[in-house]
Amino acid sequence: LLSEAGDLTPAYFEVRKIIEENFGKLPELTVKNSPKKAYGTLELTERCSVFDAAKMLAKPVHSAAPQFMEDIGQYYGYTLYSTVVDGPRDEAEIKFDAVHDRAVVFIDGEYKGFYERTRDGEPVSFSLKKGENCRIDILCENMGRVNYGPKIMDRKGVKSVRFNLQYHFGWDMYPMPLDDISALEYKEQTGEVKTASFLRGYLDIDDEPCDTFLRLDGFTKGIVLVNGFNI
């Protein structure tokens, strides 16, 4: 009955007509469809990597094992789990006892794969020679909660990380609910973006603001904030 923009569609008026034919006249509408406008291409000229952002937005919580978001005082948004692994280490797959809801894995800042709660992801394996080490970062996203049924007490985040069958201990966790990102410090963006990042651009509107739509060609997964508000 309503479009994606909340506009009244022909189907709405047909349903309204049928209701009036059977139950009498309805009150007159006082709403109108909103004006729309195309504002062209928005250049994202500034960037802050998620690894830098975590240190700007959160105080790290250290724990032997990864904790759920609720256990570190967080309820929405993202948590970055970070650890350093020393070699030597034979080829090992990163595994989780629980992923709620999407975990993206980076090794030394480079994207390697993702895990999801409800579908197959891209499992990640790694190996280290003697004297080598690497930093493993896991960016976990809370993708929403249900408010009914057996999963109503749903916890978010990751729990118990293993390399094959061996549990790994010693983690720093950075809670990022993203309700306030004003502390972020951006740098000029040059070249291709190769890791998870906050990107910023500016849209100047001289006349009365209109509704518009975002088309995110080339992007994969993320969120959009307008003047700091997560839409």
What are these regions (language model features)?
Residues G73-F106, K112:
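The feature marks the first
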Residues C48-S82, P175-G201:
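Edge strands and adjacent loops of beta-rich recognition modules
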Residues S127-R145:
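Short, well-structured beta-strand segments enriched in hydrophobic/aromatic residues
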Residues E91-F106, I136, L203-N227:
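Aromatic-lined ligand-binding clefts that engage carbohydrates, nucleic acids, or primary amines
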Residues L1-A64:
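Extended substrate-binding grooves/exosites of carbohydrate-active enzymes
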Residues H100, F106-P123, V226-I231:
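Solvent-exposed beta-strand/loop surfaces of large extracellular or lumenal domains
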Residues Y78-S82, E91-E93, E110, G121-P123, ...:
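Intrinsic-disorder/low-complexity, polar/charged segments enriched in Ser/Thr/Lys/Arg/Asp/Glu/Gln
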